[in-house]
Amino acid sequence: MNWTSLVYLWFIFKSIFADLTSHQLKSKVVFLDTTISDEVARSYLGSEDGNVTHGNYEILSIANGANDGNITSYLCQLPRTKKMAPTKPKPTMSVHELKSRAIDLISESFVEGTSCVFSFNLHANYWTIGYCHGINVIQFHENLDDFISGIHKPHSPNHVYTLGNFSKQTSPLEFEFDTKERTISQRLLGEVCDLTGEPRTIDTIYRCDHILEIVELTEIRTCQYELHINVPKLCSLPEFKRTNLEEGVSEILCTRIE
Protein backbone atom coordinates (compact mmCIF):
# COMPACT_ATOMS: atom_id res chain seq x y z
CA MET A 1 0.00 0.00 0.00
CA ASN A 2 1.63 3.28 -1.12
CA TRP A 3 1.35 6.77 0.36
CA THR A 4 -1.43 7.72 -2.05
CA SER A 5 -3.50 4.83 -0.76
CA LEU A 6 -2.77 5.70 2.85
CA VAL A 7 -3.83 9.31 2.40
CA TYR A 8 -6.94 8.21 0.55
CA LEU A 9 -7.68 5.71 3.29
CA TRP A 10 -7.36 8.39 5.96
CA PHE A 11 -9.86 10.73 4.33
CA ILE A 12 -12.39 7.96 3.77
CA PHE A 13 -12.27 6.76 7.35
CA LYS A 14 -12.34 10.34 8.60
CA SER A 15 -15.62 10.76 6.76
CA ILE A 16 -17.50 7.51 7.31
CA PHE A 17 -16.43 7.09 10.92
CA ALA A 18 -16.90 10.69 12.04
CA ASP A 19 -19.60 9.60 14.44
CA LEU A 20 -17.07 7.54 16.39
CA THR A 21 -15.03 10.60 17.32
CA SER A 22 -18.00 12.10 19.10
CA HIS A 23 -17.74 9.18 21.52
CA GLN A 24 -14.00 9.88 22.03
CA LEU A 25 -13.02 6.48 20.66
CA LYS A 26 -9.80 5.75 18.82
CA SER A 27 -10.11 3.34 15.91
CA LYS A 28 -7.57 0.78 14.75
CA VAL A 29 -8.08 -0.58 11.23
CA VAL A 30 -7.39 -4.31 10.94
CA PHE A 31 -7.23 -5.85 7.44
CA LEU A 32 -8.17 -9.51 7.79
CA ASP A 33 -6.38 -12.18 5.76
CA THR A 34 -9.64 -13.40 4.24
CA THR A 35 -11.83 -12.54 1.25
CA ILE A 36 -15.54 -12.25 0.57
CA SER A 37 -17.56 -12.16 -2.65
CA ASP A 38 -19.06 -8.90 -3.85
CA GLU A 39 -22.59 -10.33 -3.65
CA VAL A 40 -22.19 -11.40 -0.04
CA ALA A 41 -20.50 -8.12 0.87
CA ARG A 42 -23.41 -6.12 -0.57
CA SER A 43 -25.88 -8.19 1.43
CA TYR A 44 -24.23 -7.01 4.63
CA LEU A 45 -25.09 -3.42 3.77
CA GLY A 46 -28.82 -4.08 4.19
CA SER A 47 -31.81 -4.05 1.90
CA GLU A 48 -32.74 -1.35 -0.58
CA ASP A 49 -34.95 0.42 1.95
CA GLY A 50 -31.90 1.05 4.10
CA ASN A 51 -32.57 -1.43 6.89
CA VAL A 52 -29.31 -2.93 8.10
CA THR A 53 -29.58 -6.69 8.28
CA HIS A 54 -26.23 -7.80 9.69
CA GLY A 55 -24.95 -4.88 11.74
CA ASN A 56 -23.07 -1.67 10.95
CA TYR A 57 -20.97 -2.12 7.80
CA GLU A 58 -19.42 0.10 5.14
CA ILE A 59 -17.59 -0.65 1.91
CA LEU A 60 -14.17 0.96 1.67
CA SER A 61 -12.50 1.41 -1.72
CA ILE A 62 -8.77 2.15 -1.88
CA ALA A 63 -6.94 3.36 -4.98
CA ASN A 64 -3.79 1.26 -5.37
CA GLY A 65 -1.98 3.80 -7.53
CA ALA A 66 -2.06 7.46 -8.46
CA ASN A 67 -3.52 7.15 -11.98
CA ASP A 68 -3.86 3.47 -12.90
CA GLY A 69 -7.49 3.23 -11.80
CA ASN A 70 -6.85 0.01 -9.89
CA ILE A 71 -9.12 -0.08 -6.84
CA THR A 72 -9.35 -2.62 -4.03
CA SER A 73 -12.58 -2.75 -2.04
CA TYR A 74 -13.11 -3.95 1.52
CA LEU A 75 -16.16 -4.71 3.62
CA CYS A 76 -15.52 -3.03 6.97
CA GLN A 77 -17.41 -3.63 10.17
CA LEU A 78 -17.70 -0.51 12.31
CA PRO A 79 -17.33 -1.01 16.06
CA ARG A 80 -20.30 -0.55 18.29
CA THR A 81 -20.06 2.51 20.50
CA LYS A 82 -21.80 1.16 23.57
CA LYS A 83 -19.66 1.17 26.70
CA MET A 84 -18.35 -2.09 28.02
CA ALA A 85 -16.55 -2.72 31.28
CA PRO A 86 -13.03 -4.07 30.70
CA THR A 87 -12.22 -7.31 32.43
CA LYS A 88 -9.22 -7.42 34.73
CA PRO A 89 -6.88 -10.41 34.72
CA LYS A 90 -6.70 -12.55 37.80
CA PRO A 91 -3.51 -11.95 39.80
CA THR A 92 -0.85 -14.54 39.06
CA MET A 93 1.36 -13.59 42.02
CA SER A 94 1.49 -11.33 45.06
CA VAL A 95 2.07 -7.60 44.60
CA HIS A 96 5.55 -7.92 46.11
CA GLU A 97 6.43 -10.75 43.71
CA LEU A 98 4.94 -8.82 40.81
CA LYS A 99 7.02 -5.74 41.58
CA SER A 100 10.17 -7.84 41.95
CA ARG A 101 9.55 -9.51 38.59
CA ALA A 102 8.78 -6.18 36.92
CA ILE A 103 12.00 -4.66 38.30
CA ASP A 104 13.99 -7.56 36.85
CA LEU A 105 12.33 -7.18 33.44
CA ILE A 106 13.03 -3.45 33.37
CA SER A 107 16.69 -4.04 34.24
CA GLU A 108 16.99 -6.78 31.61
CA SER A 109 15.60 -4.40 28.98
CA PHE A 110 18.52 -2.03 29.40
CA VAL A 111 21.24 -4.63 29.86
CA GLU A 112 20.57 -6.25 26.48
CA GLY A 113 21.18 -3.11 24.42
CA THR A 114 22.22 0.12 26.02
CA SER A 115 21.71 1.44 29.51
CA CYS A 116 20.43 4.79 28.19
CA VAL A 117 17.56 5.98 26.02
CA PHE A 118 17.07 9.56 24.83
CA SER A 119 14.16 11.59 23.54
CA PHE A 120 14.61 14.84 21.60
CA ASN A 121 12.50 18.00 21.98
CA LEU A 122 10.23 16.31 24.50
CA HIS A 123 9.91 18.74 27.39
CA ALA A 124 8.58 22.15 26.24
CA ASN A 125 9.86 21.28 22.74
CA TYR A 126 13.35 22.27 23.84
CA TRP A 127 14.97 19.65 26.04
CA THR A 128 16.52 16.29 25.33
CA ILE A 129 15.68 13.80 28.07
CA GLY A 130 18.17 11.07 28.87
CA TYR A 131 17.20 8.06 30.95
CA CYS A 132 20.19 5.96 32.02
CA HIS A 133 18.95 2.95 33.93
CA GLY A 134 20.62 2.51 37.29
CA ILE A 135 22.39 5.86 36.94
CA ASN A 136 20.23 8.95 36.47
CA VAL A 137 17.68 10.93 34.48
CA ILE A 138 18.99 14.14 32.90
CA GLN A 139 17.76 16.91 30.67
CA PHE A 140 19.77 19.19 28.39
CA HIS A 141 19.47 21.06 25.12
CA GLU A 142 21.22 19.78 22.00
CA ASN A 143 21.16 20.26 18.25
CA LEU A 144 19.16 17.85 16.12
CA ASP A 145 22.31 16.67 14.30
CA ASP A 146 23.91 15.66 17.60
CA PHE A 147 20.78 13.78 18.63
CA ILE A 148 20.61 11.88 15.34
CA SER A 149 24.31 11.01 15.53
CA GLY A 150 23.85 9.51 18.99
CA ILE A 151 26.71 11.59 20.39
CA HIS A 152 24.30 13.69 22.49
CA LYS A 153 26.51 16.74 22.87
CA PRO A 154 24.86 19.35 25.14
CA HIS A 155 24.59 22.76 23.50
CA SER A 156 25.42 24.35 26.88
CA PRO A 157 27.50 21.95 29.05
CA ASN A 158 26.76 24.06 32.14
CA HIS A 159 23.04 23.50 31.68
CA VAL A 160 22.75 19.74 32.08
CA TYR A 161 20.24 19.09 34.84
CA THR A 162 19.96 15.88 36.85
CA LEU A 163 16.27 15.27 37.48
CA GLY A 164 16.81 12.06 39.43
CA ASN A 165 19.49 9.65 40.62
CA PHE A 166 19.07 5.91 41.11
CA SER A 167 19.98 4.36 44.44
CA LYS A 168 22.70 1.70 44.50
CA GLN A 169 20.34 -0.94 45.85
CA THR A 170 16.85 -1.28 44.37
CA SER A 171 14.04 -2.62 46.54
CA PRO A 172 10.43 -3.44 45.57
CA LEU A 173 9.43 -1.19 48.47
CA GLU A 174 10.59 1.80 46.39
CA PHE A 175 8.06 0.99 43.67
CA GLU A 176 4.30 1.50 43.41
CA PHE A 177 2.09 -0.72 41.26
CA ASP A 178 -1.04 0.94 39.84
CA THR A 179 -3.62 -1.78 39.16
CA LYS A 180 -5.92 0.58 37.25
CA GLU A 181 -3.30 2.07 34.94
CA ARG A 182 -1.25 -1.15 34.87
CA THR A 183 1.99 0.69 35.52
CA ILE A 184 4.82 0.50 38.01
CA SER A 185 6.57 3.66 39.21
CA GLN A 186 9.56 4.75 41.22
CA ARG A 187 10.41 8.17 42.68
CA LEU A 188 13.96 9.47 42.27
CA LEU A 189 15.66 12.49 43.83
CA GLY A 190 17.84 14.76 41.70
CA GLU A 191 20.02 17.81 42.15
CA VAL A 192 18.88 20.80 44.18
CA CYS A 193 16.49 23.07 42.28
CA ASP A 194 17.63 26.71 42.31
CA LEU A 195 14.00 27.87 42.33
CA THR A 196 12.78 25.89 45.35
CA GLY A 197 15.97 25.11 47.24
CA GLU A 198 14.81 21.47 47.40
CA PRO A 199 15.98 18.41 45.46
CA ARG A 200 14.25 17.85 42.14
CA THR A 201 11.96 14.80 42.13
CA ILE A 202 10.90 12.60 39.25
CA ASP A 203 8.41 9.74 39.18
CA THR A 204 9.53 7.25 36.55
CA ILE A 205 6.45 5.40 35.32
CA TYR A 206 6.95 2.18 33.36
CA ARG A 207 4.28 0.55 31.23
CA CYS A 208 3.89 -2.25 28.70
CA ASP A 209 4.28 -1.28 25.04
CA HIS A 210 6.01 -2.68 21.96
CA ILE A 211 8.93 -0.18 21.73
CA LEU A 212 11.46 0.65 24.43
CA GLU A 213 11.28 4.44 24.54
CA ILE A 214 10.65 7.58 26.54
CA VAL A 215 7.09 8.64 25.84
CA GLU A 216 6.52 11.79 27.84
CA LEU A 217 8.00 14.09 30.46
CA THR A 218 5.69 16.40 32.38
CA GLU A 219 6.66 19.03 34.93
CA ILE A 220 3.76 18.79 37.37
CA ARG A 221 5.08 21.48 39.68
CA THR A 222 8.29 23.46 39.77
CA CYS A 223 11.12 20.91 39.58
CA GLN A 224 8.71 17.98 40.10
CA TYR A 225 8.42 15.69 37.10
CA GLU A 226 6.71 12.60 35.72
CA LEU A 227 8.56 10.47 33.16
CA HIS A 228 6.68 7.82 31.16
CA ILE A 229 8.69 4.96 29.66
CA ASN A 230 7.48 2.07 27.50
CA VAL A 231 9.08 -1.29 28.34
CA PRO A 232 8.16 -4.19 26.00
CA LYS A 233 9.28 -6.89 28.44
CA LEU A 234 6.56 -5.83 30.89
CA CYS A 235 4.02 -7.13 28.37
CA SER A 236 5.02 -10.66 29.37
CA LEU A 237 3.17 -10.08 32.65
CA PRO A 238 -0.65 -10.20 32.31
CA GLU A 239 -1.00 -7.57 35.03
CA PHE A 240 0.66 -5.01 32.73
CA LYS A 241 -1.07 -5.84 29.45
CA ARG A 242 -3.79 -3.40 28.48
CA THR A 243 -6.68 -4.38 26.24
CA ASN A 244 -7.93 -2.27 23.33
CA LEU A 245 -11.01 -1.51 25.42
CA GLU A 246 -8.94 -0.08 28.26
CA GLU A 247 -6.94 2.04 25.82
CA GLY A 248 -10.15 3.43 24.35
CA VAL A 249 -9.31 1.74 21.04
CA SER A 250 -11.94 0.01 18.94
CA GLU A 251 -11.08 -2.24 16.00
CA ILE A 252 -12.49 -1.71 12.51
CA LEU A 253 -12.35 -5.12 10.82
CA CYS A 254 -12.01 -5.07 7.03
CA THR A 255 -12.29 -8.03 4.63
CA ARG A 256 -11.14 -7.77 1.01
CA ILE A 257 -13.90 -8.11 -1.60
CA GLU A 258 -13.19 -10.29 -4.63
Swiss-Prot record:
What residue range is the signal peptide? Answer: 1-18
The yes or no answer to whether the keyword Disulfide bond is present is: yes
Which cysteines share a disulfide bond?
A: 116-132, 193-223, 208-235
Domain MRH span(s) in chain numbering: 114-237
Q: Which residues cross the membrane?
A: none
A Gene Ontology biological process in which this protein takes part is: endoplasmic reticulum unfolded protein response
Q: Which GO terms describe its molecular function?
A: carbohydrate binding
Membrane-topology descriptor: Peripheral membrane protein
GO cellular component terms, semicolon-separated:
endoplasmic reticulum lumen; endoplasmic reticulum membrane
Major location category of this protein? endoplasmic reticulum
Q: Where does a mannooligosaccharide derivative bind?
A: 127, 139, 194, 200, 219, 225
Tell me the compartments it is located in.
Endoplasmic reticulum membrane
**InterPro entries, sorted:** Man6P_isomerase_rcpt-bd_dom_sf, MRH_dom, OS-9-like, OS9-like_dom
Annotated Pfam families: PRKCSH (PF07915)
Keywords assigned by UniProt, alphabetized: Disulfide bond, Endoplasmic reticulum, Glycoprotein, Lectin, Membrane, Signal
Glycosylation-annotated residues: 2, 51, 70, 165
Describe the task this protein carries out. Answer: Lectin involved in the quality control of the secretory pathway. As a member of the endoplasmic reticulum-associated degradation lumenal (ERAD-L) surveillance system, targets misfolded endoplasmic reticulum lumenal glycoproteins for degradation.
* Similarity comment: family membership: Belongs to the OS-9 family.
**Name by which UniProt lists this protein:** Protein OS-9 homolog
Species of origin reads Candida albicans (strain SC5314 / ATCC MYA-2876)
